[in-house]
């Protein structure tokens, strides 16, 4: 499904307050172009160091995205952002178009639109329709 977005000339990215190991894995499987996530750190005995490196604080996604967008030579108004939680609401308000991927209308009202459907195909079909207008 992601290849359909690439055919439209879109770049894809994951921004998560989760861990980079998982974000990288998902990005590779889905052929996502970029990912931003928090890093795990290990000591010389390969033991996990508590805290790691926080690159995407849970409450600062919009700030991290804005920095990333600027570094890529883009504008926030050029971004289509898809989120599924209350922690995405600040980002919804800063980007050009936002999609809340949820069946919760109270969360959905914070985005440009919301989708209550399963699977990436539904999301990709919606974005493809946006570009055919």
Where does each model-flagged region fall?
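C-terminal cap/substrate-recognition subdomain and adjoining C-terminal extension
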Residues: 1-133
């Amino acid at each position: 499904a992601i290849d359909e977005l690439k055919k439209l000339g879109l770049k894809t990215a994951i921004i998560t307050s989760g861990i980079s190991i998982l974000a990288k894995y998902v990005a590779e499987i889905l052929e996502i172009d970029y990912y931003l996530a928090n890093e795990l750190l290990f000591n010389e005995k390969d033991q996990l160091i508590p805290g790691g490196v926080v690159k995407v604080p849970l409450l600062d996604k919009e700030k991290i995205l804005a920095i990333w967008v600027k570094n890529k030579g883009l504008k926030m108004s050029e971004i289509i952002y898809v989120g599924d939680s209350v922690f995405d609401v600040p980002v919804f308000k800063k980007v050009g178009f936002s999609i809340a991927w949820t069946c919760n209308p109270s969360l959905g009202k914070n985005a440009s639109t919301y989708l209550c459907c399963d699977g990436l195909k539904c999301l990709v079909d919606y974005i493809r329709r946006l570009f055919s207008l």
